[in-house]
Structure formats: C-alpha cells, structure tokens
Amino acid sequence: MQVLPPSSTGGPSRLFIMRPVATTLLMVAILLAGIIGYRALPVSALPEVDYPTIQVVTLYPGASPDVMTSAVTAPLERQFGQMSGLKQMSSQSSGGASVITLQFQLTLPLDVAEQEVQAAINAATNLLPSDLPNPPVYSKVNPADPPIMTLAVTSTAMPMTQVEDMVETRVAQKISQISGVGLVTLSGGQRPAVRVKLNAQAIAALGLTSETVRTAITGANVNSAKGSLDGPSRAVTLSANDQMQSAEEYRQLIIAYQNGAPIRLGDVATVEQGAENSWLGAWANKEQAIVMNVQRQPGANIISTADSIRQMLPQLTESLPKSVKVTVLSDRTTNIRASVDDTQFELMMAIALVVMIIYLFLRNIPATIIPGVAVPLSLIGTFAVMVFLDFSINNLTLMALTIATGFVVDDAIVVIENISRYIEKGEKPLAAALKGAGEIGFTIISLTFSLIAVLIPLLFMGDIVGRLFREFAITLAVAILISAVVSLTLTPMMCARMLSQESLRKQNRFSRASEKMFDRIIAAYGRGLAKVLNHPWLTLSVALSTLLLSVLLWVFIPKGFFPVQDNGIIQGTLQAPQSSSFTNMAQRQRQVADVILQDPAVQSLTSFVGVDGTNPSLNSARLQINLKPLDERDDRVQKVIARLQTAVDKVPGVDLFLQPTQDLTIDTQVSRTQYQFTLQATSLDALSTWVPQLMEKLQQLPQLSDVSSDWQDQGLVAYVNVDRDSASRLGISMADVDNALYNAFGQRLISTIYTQANQYRVVLEHNTEITPGLAALDTIRLTSSDGGVVPLSSIAKVEQRFAPLSINHLDQFPVTTISFNVPDNYSLGDAVQEIMDTEKTLNLPVDITTQFQGSTLAFQSALGSTVWLIVAAVVAMYIVLGILYESFIHPITILSTLPTAGVGALLALMIAGSELDVIAIIGIILLIGIVKKNAIMMIDFALAAEREQGMSPRDAIYQACLLRFRPILMTTLAALLGALPLMLSTGVGAELRRPLGIGMVGGLIVSQVLTLFTTPVIYLLFDRLALWTKSRFARHEEEA
C-alpha cells in the first residue's frame, strides 16, 4: 500500500512559486474572464429543465363534450399518437373546446416537435368536421406553466368589445412577436361580432325557419375573387359591394319576400354589435377587463422576456386611447430577481463568515488575506466556465457557489497551514512554501478528485430531476477544480511573499488568548483520543450504531419532492354545482372576489369564467391571486391560502381550491391542487363506477386535504329524441334537426366580416330572452320536403338526462384526475403510501390502471433512485481513492466517516421539521464529499509518518490526528459557516435553500465530533486486518 511520495521541491507548485508575476497575471486573467462571464450570464429562477410541450386548441362553438371527443379530439389524437419522441398526450374535450397537450422527451428539440405536430394536424384535416370555424391552433407552451406576466386592460368610456379589438390588434400581436414569448392569451371573451338574435315566434308566424335566415346571411356576405378585365390599353380589377360591415347593414338585409313585400332581417331578429362569445368574462379585482396572460416558450429566458415586454409597454400604451388603462397585475420575475438577490447576499455572507473563521484560527492578517483572495477568485472564475456551458445565474447555481465557499477555502487553508508550520519551525518563507506545497500537493489532489467523484452520479440522474441538478453539480465541480488550481499556484506563491516568522509570531491579546484556547482544546482532544484508542471495539460499536441509526432515520423521516415555494402568486379554481350557468357562475365569482380582496395580504386578483383552453366548463372559474411582496405581509403563502379558504367557505354553493405557483412545473394540465393521481380505463362507464368509490375513501384520509376530482358526470342534458320514421315521412333529415338546433342555441358562427385590420364573425342564435329555458325548444321550426314548416315538437320529444361536462383522455384512453394537497403535519411520502394502500383495498379491475402524475410521479422516480444515487457516489469515491492510494483498504477507512454525516443531516432535518426532499438529498451527497476530508488529512500524514519516520501505526495516526486537528476543525467550520446562511435564510425562495443548509450544518456538526475519534480506530483495525491477511498469505506460500 503505497502513496505517491510528497515532493520536497514544490512539485507542481514550484513553477508558480518561482514566477510570481506570471502567476499573478494568470489569476488576473481568470478574474477578468469571470467578471465578463458574470455580466453575460442570464438570470432565471431555476435551470431550464422544461419538457418540450405543445398545446393544440380547437374551438367548435356549440358542440357537446361527446361531439368534441369523437369528431375533433379522437382524430387528432390518432395522428399525434404516431409521432416519435412523444412522452405523454393528454386531452380535455368540453363544450365547444378541445385542448390536447403533447409532452415530448427531454432530448427532443422543440422545433422538431413543432414540425411533427404541424404534419399531424395536416394529416387529420380531412377527418375533422367540415363546418369547423377555424383549424386547430398549436402553441409552444405548457398550459400548466403559470404566466410570466399578467396584464389587465380596462376602460371607463369604451365597451369591452372595442377594448379587446384594440388589445388584439395593437398590443397582443406585438407582445407575441417578442423573442421568448410562447403564447399571449386574452381572457374576457369580448371579441367584436355582429350578433343576430332570432325571434322564434316572428319567424314561425312568417312561415320561415332559422335555416332560411342562415342561408340568406351567408349568401349575402361573401368575400371572394371576381377577376379582372384586361383590355388593349388598360387592366381593370373587378370589385363589388359583396361585404356587409355593420350591424345596420345586416339589419336591412332582405331574407325573403311574402306577398311581394320584403322581409328584412331586422323584422325577425335583433341585430346588434356584441361579443363573439357571450359566455366568457374576465375581471381585474372588481372591474371587468380584458386580461392578457403572457406565457413563455419552453427554454426561453424568463428575465429577458419580461424585460422586453416592459420595455415595449410604454410604446404600446401610447397608441391606445387615454380612457384605456393597461396595468401589470403580476410579474413573476419580480420574485425571481428578489430570490436571486437574496441568494447572492447569502453568498457574500458565506464568504465573510469563512474569512472570519480563517482569521480566528490563523490570527494573522497576511495569512488571512491569502485565502481571502483565493475564495472569491475561485468563485468568480466559475462564471467564465458557466457562460461556455450555457448556464444561468439561478437559485441552484448560486446555492452551489455558496456551498463551494466552504469547499474552496479548504484547499487554501490546508496549504497555508502546512507552509506556516514550516515557517514557524524556522524555515525561510520561500523554502517553506516549496516544501509545504510539495508535501501537501497530493492531499489537495486527493481532496479535489474524491469530492468531484461524489458529484459524478448527479450528472447521470435521469429525467427532469437530473436536468435540474446538472447545473448545480457542474458549477460546484468547476469551482472546486479552480480552487485546487489556485491553491497549488497562487496560494503558495503568496505564502512565500507575504508570510514570515515575524508576522506569524506577532501576536496581540486576542491572538494569545485564542492560541491558549486552541492548545487546551488540542490537549483535551489528545487525552480523549488516547482513551478511545485503548477501547477500539467500543468505538467501533459506536460507528456501527451510527450506520444503523442512519438507516432507521432514512426509513422514518418524512419524505417530499421539492420544497413548496412562496413566489407571491396563488392559482385558484372555483367550483360550483355542475348545472351552473355562465350568469350564475359569474355572480358567484364576484362574491368570492369580494371576500378575497379583503385579505390584507392580497394585492390584486384576476378571475375568469367561461370555457377556453384552460377552463373546461361553465361551472368553474379560474383565479390568480397576487400577494403583496414578502416584506409587506405578515404571513407566508400557505397561511394566506388557509385563511382565504376559511373565508370563502362562508360563500354558499362554491368550493375554492388554491395552490401557490412554483418555479418548477412538471404537470401538463392546470390542476386544482399541487398533486395528482389518475385512473385510466377503456370506457367512461368503468370510471363512473370506480371514481366515486375511490374518492369516498381518499376524502377520509387525514394525510390528504382538498381532495377533488375532475370527474363531472352530472351535467344537465336536454336530449332530443327524434322519431326518425316521422321525420323521414316529412322529408326531414337528422342533419336538418342538428342545423336547426345549432342555429338556435350554438352561438353559430355563420359568416365572416373582413376588414383591413382583422376579421369578425356573424353569430346566429335564438333570442332566449323572449323564450328562456327548455321552452325555447318548442319554438324550433323545420322545413319539410313540401316546403311546409314543421315544429320540432311534432317529431321529437325532449328528455332531461345527465352527461359529463368534459371528457378527458390520457394517451387516447379515458382518464380522470384526482387532485389533492398534503396537510402541514404530513409529508408527500405519507400521502403517496396511503393512496397506494387505499387503492389495494378496492381491488380495482384489470382494465383500470392508476398512476401518479406531475410532481408526484417525479417524486416517486426520485425517491426510487436516491439510494442508488448515494451508492453510486460512494462507489465512485471508493474507486478514485483506491486509485490515488493504490490500496483497497484505506478508501474503506475514509468512507467509514459517511454514516455520521447521514445521521447528523437526517436528525437536523427532523428537528427542524423539514422533509427529506431532493434538495436535502443533494446536501447529504455533498456531505459524503466533505466529511471524508477529515479522514484523508489524517491518513495522509499517518502514512507519511510510518513511511518516512518509521513510526508504529498507532503512534503515526495519533500524531497525525493532533497535527491535523486544527486544519480539520478550520475546514469543517468553514464548510459549516458556508452553509449557515442557507440554513438561516428567510427571504424570497428561502424554502428552496433552507433544506440544503439544514442538512449540511447538522451533518457537519455530528460528523466532526465523531470522525475525529472513529477514523483513527478504524484505521488501526484495518491495519491489523492487513497485517493478518499478509501473514496468512505468507504462511500459505511457505506451505506451498
């Protein structure tokens, strides 16, 4: 078992020690490159880890959910299902709208996915209804991703139809053109149109039908090519008054003649300028508004996108009338910037604390300046590499640099402490620097590569979690590598020029007092260590008990996925009885808005009622609650949510579901709560049987809260049961019946008005204000084969039935999603386990499959790979240490320190009430790399003492422990203080940073206390084992 012999001539550091100018200029180059890189790096909340996601929306006004599913969604799904690289396809078919969300594999470029989607839509065109008003429209956006910015446009003098027209033509188009913007949606549904409201009684009295009116309007308003005349000397383009532009022109349209007298449209209908869809509405606070939600493209830089929007807004608002007001209600980048600023402050605090601890130990200003230069240089230099790797300044990379503060200073401390020891013995500074740097060079290399080895498994983590922590791991590894370079170049060079016997011996009262304190501590440690070495088996039992305890703690600690962040925005869903109308829902929404706006933490509120790409039915409403900045409110988001739900519970007939927006969005659909669980079947009937049973059981579990389902099968349906024989005798087809119903109740888009700026629709419907409710069906008239008018009631009966309000698919099969939250006193792991146990008690049939979705599915995947991740880190470190030490045994001695770190981290998390989530797990993996440093420093010097001074293993390890006690304590405290700002974090995004700090501080404290005693004992035990093994082999050889 040999190690590389330390060099007494400076080793790789010699060149840099002897050439101070070249070394200084090299470090200046690293510093300048880092500063330039820092200024060039984009800022974001988290690394870009979005799945390539595309949303396809098809609108078919008046179509029932069943028609939308069979006629629109299913043909599209069949084509989309043939695309390569598709990870998941979900769809939602509701009244008049089909929304299909396509999530592709992480490795597939978004542009490639877009091409495949466009080709699939083209292939499905001939399979879609011929009267579809518009073809399917796709957007490169994840509908579950909260908007980066929400704007409200209001006016005190103009109707909402004119406001929306201006917003759509002047504002939304310009914002959509900004790089990084994926989709601009206008909520409020006030797009201008000419609405024709037929008077059913008047039509019937004149012997007309709605189909007669529709045919007359479509024939009177056309916009087609007419040709041109090409004469001998000039060409003339043909044009005609074939377009009608205003409601007044339509009002004067002659639709028929009776007894020679014209019947104009205005005689049988109310014709007016109105909204294209009267069942849509949006509000900003209490004022009706057009709400613009701006969503980014997956992978786009959120900060630069938001900045571009804000820069454009003044120019856009200048083009609007003075009565129109544009208000930015929410901007996610505000909290992102605040979170990044807080993390940067914690990084500076970590640097300051580390420098302070260095001075406390070295008690010398020149000796403190040296690592004080090395630390920021290593961190700043990392920014240059981050630019080339297309990284960003985000919470995770800044957390990596904050943690790196404690790591990178270790190398400089070890070098300085070793060089100082020789200077204090009387060596000249230059000779001491050469000797000390050469002696410690191998230790620095061992520390560096064994620590980087721990990070290697993070690079191979799969799926979105792996992508998420790749930037973290690489950033930390780069900082550690640069630190090693600085410690072997700049640090010994500065020691040779700045340290001297006089400077090291110069002491003040503080220096003398601290020196005595450290001497007493080392003496006490020496006495304790001697006792421990005399009772090795007792110490070994303590080490083994920490291993057992760490396993037990791992089993019983609450487990989660990702910390719930307070980003100042709450997404809400308001649910009313399934038969609620738009008018009823809008009234309930305003009642809820009044209650929410009274909360002192709420700054603004936007709400939306109606069916569109995100809202599936008329009995639900979407809300976005924007909270005041964190420093202006007393409570964090979870307490605000609990308070709002309690207040809204007093509003009768509604259920409110709230969840805070998160920087990490894995879901592909807008959910009522944070977590989802799906049931998938081959038929809707199977879901209708088992969903209520499972819901009943889940709602009784204390580990779950806000349990709800998107299964809504009690929507009222007026089923028109046509007597086909009677209809056939009269020459009336089912197409005639459908057309008559569609004309009356479908807000049918029957014609288009073309202008230079935009296109507007003509909407046909019955005036239900004259004959409201189901009685309106009695006014429907059909034309028989002999030209007579036949009441619908003579050939059909109307039955009231129940049907789903929306039909959801997952990978082309019917699915229902059960949403839930987790109460504060339980963890996501508890909830997942209870759901799986409950599912087993139901004995679901084989044709029903269940699966967690979104972040819950990612949690299961991360939890399943965590143990293997830790094993991989340990194995990687063993291999590196084995290669460096040319030994199978010494790496085991070093790795024996790891259980103590796990025990400390898990205990700290449990005491602090934190879950074991992916952030905390990363902390534990980092601890694996930190705590083994103690053992490396002990074993390196013990092996050198055995080899060079001929000491016995016991004397060698005892001396090594006392000799390296101060640098071990110093490096551990430096790492601990580097993590301390994260643990004590209270600002924006603190929820994300705190678990990492808690785990590392707890692990470092426990491991520091235990490994100082267990490592030398285990070293001696393995040394004895090695001698026994050698003697056995020698005996066998002699016998042979």
From Swiss-Prot:
> What domain of life is recorded for the organism?
Bacteria
Cell membrane as a keyword of this entry, yes or no, is yes
Q: Name one GO molecular function term.
A: xenobiotic transmembrane transporter activity
Keywords from the UniProt entry: Cell inner membrane, Cell membrane, Membrane, Transmembrane, Transmembrane helix, Transport
Topology of this chain in the membrane: Multi-pass membrane protein
Q: Name one GO cellular component term.
A: plasma membrane
Q: What stretches pass through the bilayer?
A: 16-36, 347-367, 369-389, 396-416, 440-460, 472-492, 537-557, 863-883, 888-908, 911-931, 968-988, 998-1018
Q: Does the keyword field hold Zinc? A: no
Q: Which Gene3D superfamilies match?
A: Multidrug efflux transporter AcrB pore domain, Multidrug efflux transporter AcrB pore domain like, Multidrug efflux transporter AcrB TolC docking domain, DN and DC subdomains, Multidrug efflux transporter AcrB transmembrane domain
The intrachain disulfides are: none
Its annotated compartments are: Cell inner membrane
User: What broad class describes the main subcellular location of this protein?
Assistant: membrane
Q: Which family does it belong to?
A: Belongs to the resistance-nodulation-cell division (RND) (TC 2.A.6) family. MdtB subfamily.
PANTHER family with a match to the protein in the record = MULTIDRUG RESISTANCE PROTEIN MDTB, PTHR32063
Subunit structure of this chain's protein: Part of a tripartite efflux system composed of MdtA, MdtB and MdtC. MdtB forms a heteromultimer with MdtC.
Q: What is this protein called?
A: Multidrug resistance protein MdtB
